[in-house]
């Protein structure tokens, strides 16, 4: 399953693919899911812990527990993963597990930009929650998420997000090269990073936009 997913899915930092081998029985389990979309506590409680303890035949658990559904069509794998399902392969059979984690309850309203129409919620300071929001707003297997760190001391984490099918390769390379050329010790805000990427104090036409609106991010990805 994991080898096939590497072919049909775009590479993404948030796509977790694990092969787990039981230390006593030697049985193997393959597991795949998008980290921002799922509740890892559910993964541990329903999959990894029962498999490792082996107190009950794991195949019996997969077949008897209503949280697991047998998947017979590989064409549905991508959609299931993008909808917050975890995929499990055990003894040459594929099962899906609903581990969806998706909530807007802790989000604040957008401050940088207001909108009369569309969602009023902004991104979260927690990058995993923000990636959850973006993946739910832009449900596509072509969405690529790359992680980088900037700042020699701060090692500030950032994510480059783009649609592999629609992205302008030249622009993507330009952004990657500019990010790689940032050599400050501390990067503490998006505004500071924007000034470093622009390279100029004043520009006749803007080339970068800072936004926290979900609808604008989805629209930008779709171009």
What do these predicted regions represent?
Residues 1-223:
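Membrane-embedded alpha-helical signal segments
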């Amino acid at each position: 399953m994991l080898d096939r997913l590497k072919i049909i899915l775009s590479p993404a930092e948030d796509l977790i693919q694990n092969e787990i081998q039981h230390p006593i029985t030697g049985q193997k389990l393959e597991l795949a899911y998008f980290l921002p979309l799922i509740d890892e506590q559910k993964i541990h409680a329903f999959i990894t812990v029962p498999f490792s303890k082996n107190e009950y035949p794991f195949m019996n658990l997969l077949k008897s527990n209503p949280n697991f559904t047998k998947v017979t069509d590989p064409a549905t794998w991508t959609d299931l993963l993008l909808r917050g399902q975890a995929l499990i392969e055990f003894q040459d059979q594929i099962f899906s597990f609903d581990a969806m984690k998706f909530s807007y309850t802790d989000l604040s309203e957008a401050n940088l930009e207001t909108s009369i129409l569309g969602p009023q919620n902004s991104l979260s300071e927690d990058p995993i929650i923000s990636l959850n929001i973006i993946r739910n707003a832009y449900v596509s297997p072509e969405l690529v998420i790359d992680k980088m760190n900037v700042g020699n001391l701060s090692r500030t984490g950032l994510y480059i997000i783009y649609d592999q099918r629609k992205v302008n390769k030249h622009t993507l390379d330009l952004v990657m090269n500019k990010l790689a050329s940032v050599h400050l010790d501390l990067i503490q805000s998006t505004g500071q990073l924007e000034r470093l990427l622009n390279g100029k104090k004043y520009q006749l036409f803007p080339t970068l936009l800072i936004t926290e609106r979900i609808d604008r991010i989805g629209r930008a990805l779709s171009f």
